[in-house]
Amino acid sequence: MKAKEYLRTIQKLESETKECYGQAEYLKNAINNLSNQNAIETVEELIVDLMDEASDYAIHRVHLINELLNVDDPMQYTLLHYRYCLDYSWHKIAYKLKASVGFVKNLHGEALKSLDRYLEDCCNAEKE
């Protein structure tokens, strides 16, 4: 898996988690309009399933985020975290890092290379 794909997976897991929570919240509100006990129990089971699914997505996302700590330097990790976990713009990242947008974009390229190397090393280690 390449760095960009890895980082998109982190973003997708966040989206999936939010989607599950949103669906569960919608169903919680819909229960109030139901009178059939069997229907209520079915919806309650769906809510539990959605919350379990959201939890699984969140746990997987945390594991992937923790692996970002293996990039070459803490500033690269911080940049990747801001960009792909917190969805910050380039300008906001530059402001937070007290750097220019150009510097941040260059650092981003280096961080992607570092993450690619780490992911390649992991992949090679698994093959051995």
Features from the language model and the residues they span:
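N-terminal interaction/assembly modules
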Residues: 1-68, 120-128
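Alpha-helix capping at helix-to-loop junctions
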Residues: 73, 85, 113, 117-120
